């Protein structure tokens, strides 16, 4: 039995499987944080002593399904994030590029900076710092099967549709209502077609799912819980710090009990 030959075959199989699912994370962090306020952008705001965006990046760094990370940020912040990634051991970052005038343009800039190997793109909000590596992986695996999948959470409150004057028009069946979050993961070729079709037609959407939907493609919903919030106001910081503190406590207790986490 030729061990070297068998090892070579196994490596080739592993490489082939990786090529089919090579996933590039595009982290959108170029916003001006107008609703957040303050002198620094929310991505730079410290959360448990660490800039908010670092928490987000660590989740994608630790997700086995993610092969590279492209950060899209403000041009003047690029050196800052280069240093932070080095300081915090975030090694999957391949490029840090400047954003565009809109979120769609920023994500498109990130798309063009991904590796030629990229087969899937996982588009994430830099401000969703409570996403976990396990949730990222679950959404990615759904996308590998359906070519499009998104983190989401079922609505638990009664949902009302209102008119422009602030009066209820109708009540929606909440069993069919989901709140979309990120990551939103797509086959790279599919998302590229969706993004450039939207650009050509002047379509502006509030999330990347809508661009893919506009092509007539279905997007699989993956329940990721209510904690996957997007930090929007300073009040959200307190909520996020509470969640992170609780997770740290649970991790410490598990380690003390001899359970690896």
Regions found by a protein language model. Name each.
Residues 27, 53, 110, 125, ...:
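Residue-level signal for inorganic ion chemistry
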Residues 1-26, 30, 62, 207-209, ...:
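SAM-dependent methyltransferases
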Residues 105-120:
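Active-site nucleotide-sugar/metal-binding loop of Leloir-type enzymes
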Residues 79-84:
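Acidic helix N-cap motif at the loop->helix transition within catalytic regions
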Residues 88-101:
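Conserved donor nucleotide-binding strand/loop of the catalytic core
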Residues 9, 13-78:
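N-terminal glycine-rich phosphate-binding loop and ensuing alpha1 helix
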Residues 130-222, 259-261:
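Conserved core of the sugar-phosphate nucleotidyltransferase
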Residues 46, 130, 185, 230-231:
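Short aromatic/basic micro-patch
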């Amino acid at each position: 039995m030729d061990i070297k030959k068998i090892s070579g075959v196994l490596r080739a199989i592993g490489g082939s499987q990786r090529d089919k699912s090579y996933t590039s994370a595009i982290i959108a962090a170029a916003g001006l944080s107008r609703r957040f306020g303050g002198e620094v952008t929310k991505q730079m705001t410290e959360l448990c002593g660490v800039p908010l965006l670092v928490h987000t990046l660590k989740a994608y760094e630790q997700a086995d399904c993610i092969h590279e990370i492209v950060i899209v940020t403000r041009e003047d912040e690029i050196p800052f994030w280069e240093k932070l990634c080095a300081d915090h051991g975030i090694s999957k970052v391949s490029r840090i590029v400047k954003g565009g005038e809109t979120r769609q343009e920023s994500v498109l800039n990130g798309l063009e900076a991904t590796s030629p190997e990229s087969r899937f793109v996982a588009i994430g909000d830099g401000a969703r710092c409570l996403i976990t590596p396990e949730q990222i992986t679950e959404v990615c695996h759904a996308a590998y099967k359906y070519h499009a999948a998104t983190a989401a959470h079922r609505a638990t409150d009664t949902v009302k549709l209102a008119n422009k004057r602030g009066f209820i028009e109708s009540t929606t069946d909440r069993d069919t209502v989901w709140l979309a979050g990120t990551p939103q993961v797509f086959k790279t070729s599919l998302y590229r077609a969706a993004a450039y079709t939207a650009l050509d037609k002047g379509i502006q959407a509030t999330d990347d799912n809508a661009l893919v939907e506009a092509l007539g493609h279905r997007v699989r919903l993956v329940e990721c819980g209510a904690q996957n919030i997007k930090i929007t106001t300073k009040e959200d910081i307190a909520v996020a710090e509470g969640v992170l503190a609780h997770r740290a406590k649970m991790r410490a207790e598990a380690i003390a009990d001899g359970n690896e986490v």
